[in-house]
Amino acid sequence: MTRIQKFAQVAVVALLAVLAISVALPASAHAQSDATAQRIFRIGMDSSWAPKLSQTLFDSIGPRLTASPAHHAAGDWVTKMYKEWGIEAKKEQYGTWRGWRRGTSHIDLMQPRVRSLEGTMLAWSPGTNGRPVTAEAIILPKFVDSTEFVKWLPQARGKIVLLSPSFPTCRPSEDWLKFATAESMARMDTTIALMNREWAVMTDATGRPDSTKLYRGTGYSLALGTGTLGTRLEKAGVAGMISSRNKLSGFTNPFAGANGGGRGGAGGGRGGRGGAGGSAGTGSMRGGGPGAAGTAANAGRGGFGGGPGGAGGWGVIEIFESYNTIAPAVTLMCEDYSLVYRLAENKQRPMVRLDLDASLLGEQPTFNVIGQIKGTEKPNEYVMLSAHFDSWDGGSGATDNGTGTMMAMEAMRILKLAYPKPKRTIMVGHWASEEQGLNGSTAFTADHPEVMKGLQALFNQDNGTGRVQSLSSSGLTDIGPHLKSWYGILPSFFTDSMSSNVVSWSFNDVPTGNPGGTDGAVFACFATPSIGMGAVGWNYSTYTWHTNRDTYDKVVMDDLKHNATLAALMVYAASEDPTFISREKSPGQWPANWPANCGTPPRSTKPRL
């Protein structure tokens, strides 16, 4: 999911957790005697294909950057699997997006000593066309304004520009909390606070971003990767650019307070699942112990420990994108980026060699994968599984959102075996370009008004590998009673309040904010019953969300089996429900901007550029 949208989504979930009506009812006698429900449960838990499917998708095919060759190969594979199971499926093109092929990345320090550096290209970066580029690395200065920046640009010609701050320690916050003296921690606090202030987006007198200054006074944005600043530097003739977005610093992860640690105030220590904060870190790293679950009111603003940077995961970097077409853009791990930065800072003239294999492929077809099991009694009413199929490609796209994809695929396989003649049509949507702004799902809703009209329920999952522990929705008067009745179909495995597998449901009459930053939010524009599936964390935001460590080994297969089985059971219950969910909105004062994800979907890269 996208960073800003993810922040909005988790803010809503946090508020729902406080305000919503939550119940955990004992399983009904009907659940224990329903032969189809029991068959679904046994197939899902005893003969899961999740490990086999996951290994093929994550290891063999790999990450699914929108419109890349791997994205197309993955779409062909999913379609093939569905057809082998007797499920109708197709790749449904809705537009184009810029295509890109990732090859090898070799990044080396050549002077003042030789060292291979740990890093890779940003997505959509140009390569070096078979001719390695060696150039001096220089730090992007801080400018008074964009005029001063333009005057400086000739000095950057032929150089590799360092675009990020050098984080003063690459150790995790836990080390500092456990081993550091009070004096040492205080000094590190001050150093980090100064770094954040020095590299933060520049603001005007009202505290809003100053459009004439923005990042380092350049007047350009760094965005998720190199942004418009990268294209301006490219125009000036730089040889390349290097950034580093580690998970240690509030600065490098300014919106992660939604999942970061601590209770806020002066920082939050190691932090559990923090609140809805989003400012650059300015506080202390001495917050006490694991942070409690938070809301917008107590969100962490800490510097190192519990602030917006989260729990301080190390050994990971976030890998996003570049809009360059000539100058390559790479990202380095914290340790190696800091090495190059210190050499440049101390005027020791680091020379870096980039040898990068990549192909910019121009606009390529992009698509959603749509599958269905046709309904026998009400074929024009639909129950839908939803998960985005695309990913960033620094890792394997395993937990974001390969596990959501696997949940949906495995649930469809189970349903075809245990419930082959559903009352309503069962659909699955594997969306493209979620990471670029929910583009694939938005296009589907625009192209399929008949599905929007007949949608009984949509179940969306996009929050990592953990087992689903909550089902939640809001806005429509009729959703609550239906969720309650569907809950009654679940075997005791999911309803025993003493079990770690227990699943609760919640309903909030009036939405408390924007419906969030994943594809389920798009369906709220059409007042459809969109149900979110909330999962346990497994340090998702800290270690695998958008990082180089989002790989097969991070998947918790038992939790994935749990999720696929639960999804299949809920789809079965929604399909069998004798009544259709009303579109009547709940009374009350709704947020003025709700929902905020509506609009015309981009059908090509051009609007983004």
What are these regions (language model features)?
Residues 208, 216, 248-315, 603-609:
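Disordered, low-complexity segments in secreted/periplasmic proteins that are enriched in proline
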Residues 34-36, 125-150, 288-398, 410-413, ...:
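Soluble metallo-hydrolase cores and metallopeptidase-like ectodomains found primarily
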Residues 10-24:
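Bacterial N-terminal signal peptides
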Residues 211-217, 221-222, 230, 234, ...:
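Active-site-adjacent substrate-binding region
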Residues 33, 42, 55, 59-206:
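Noncatalytic luminal/extracellular "stalk/propeptide" segments of secretory-pathway proteins
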Residues 52, 414-439, 458:
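Short helix-loop-beta-strand segments that form the rim/entrance of peptidase-like active sites
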Residues 113-116, 130-135, 144, 154-158, ...:
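Metal-dependent peptidase/peptidase-like ectodomains
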Residues 29-71, 80, 373-377, 584, ...:
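N-terminal hydrophobic or amphipathic helices/low-complexity stretches enriched
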